[in-house]
């Protein structure tokens, strides 16, 4: 049994009467529905108390799609048991058949709908179910009372308040998104090319609402040149061109025809027969009536099945990952003689270019580093045989857009939250966002939600009308502190200690160490235990202001130097009248920390709370290295030695700001790094003694490399951890210019490091690519 059949079978026989099938454009939702209906028709299970499936209604939004669906069902189910297939649309009025395929526009007419009894159909399928919040769909679904209703869509998420998941009782029969479909080889591979839109007189265009520019002869020639350069798969081109407006599509079609191409344009006003004829001319064999391209704005975003398309051209900005994916999907259906589809995306300096990597990857976490990696490495992070390439000028535009993008806005967080809530049918927990491809829930901790603090609770209290939990000011403050400092899941120790206190009403060092070893395989050192207590007793503060502000945010109190107990403040917070809501929020946060740790940080590097190739901030590093006090980024500078833990992190900003001291840190290759010391350091300085381990006390010093690609991004000041390294040879004296612009030089020394593990190739290329 197909997985979609199996899940639908379970839902169908559980007593539910609706479900949703989510499948990427091009993966064959219609065939999946046909096979599912056939499977259910062949079953004989009287115990489910549903009447046999004899009559089926398939509702679509265009006649052309109804015709294609009718043909697909007829192929799968056949007619050996008397099945008949008909169309109900503006041009067809077949009502007396066992399988009826109808357009929503015709069926929703009162004079048509009244001809059907509420129980006229046993099984109803709603295609493009994300439209089902519209009034016409509501009308039909309210009229009919089938045994079962199945919604089908590639994109159930909507930008309005309509909840598609609720309409289908939050029952998901099957879900496969674009990335998975490519992984499973269900789609035709695509070769995506991000191409610079036209410059006129060697100047980049700024106003892309300028109709004269959009339809200029120069732009037409530019598009044709690139289309010829990147070709297509098959005997002749069969392309779709998506434009910004109907007028642009019309004029560009006329101009392309002047270049011996055969094109037409279609709009929402085009008659069904005109659309059908155009599609047949595009998809068919070469001949006098054949078309090379159809130009449109959005009528081919969904539903229409044209497997023969071998080239898709985007002449409009990406404003929505959903629409981008829908339009990309027009070319992803497999067809005979078609090895791949070519995607040409003409990219100007648009503000929302950062949405392109989101759409191509299908990653809705909005993690900027993931976006950059796709732009830089493209093909290496796209599954299957598909490829992604950007021209350098385009790549720079998209990277700049990523730098400038705000990916933790209230609007974005609320949209992602609502999508997950709609899907689940309840208020999501923090752990729900990852498995349902939601935004990285850490972003909820990055904003202050009025007086509620920087936590998921703060977001819920401010924006979720169905949330009834209430915390005291101190509880909200404590939750905000835990979320901001430990919510990223880079270390589980603090979360485990809080959990131990909640579950046992108190705890001590011995019990905690036993639990840490038993549950996570971590042998707690004295330095780790000391650092945890400092962090949970308001003694490891980033600033003096924080210490004063958080003076009552104390979870444990030290007992001597080797033990601790629950702090009075935390004990009160766990036992006042709002403690139940507080504990629910704490447990949700703890579960999220464990989840994130398991996903990203559980492969600990040499018994340290660091994971190779993961990212860490200036704030993370002193804590995770178990330093006894926080050291600011300004004091750390490029490196800092801690004598208690015998650790020396080296922090490299690979893209320097223009006003930075001219440090020439660079990789020679994946194994060797050249780095400079701080200024006013000589080859016989203490820094050189430590780095080159010239004294016995420095023999076991751990020199740890952290590198980040971009220093200008205010949202993601994080460094890749690339492991331990060792200085080789000896310090080489150099003179570097001072920052004051006087040209005066100061002393420093150069170090050649050898990494103990070569930098992973994709990270190396991403960091070093200019």
Feature map (PLM): residue ranges:
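Walker A/P-loop
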Residues: 14-38
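Conserved segment of the helicase C-terminal RecA-like domain
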Residues: 321-326, 330-364
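Post-DEXD/H (motif II) to motif III coupling segment of the RecA-like Helicase ATP-binding lobe
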Residues: 131-191
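Conserved helicase ATPase core of P-loop NTP-dependent helicases/translocases
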Residues: 89-93, 112, 250-251, 261-300
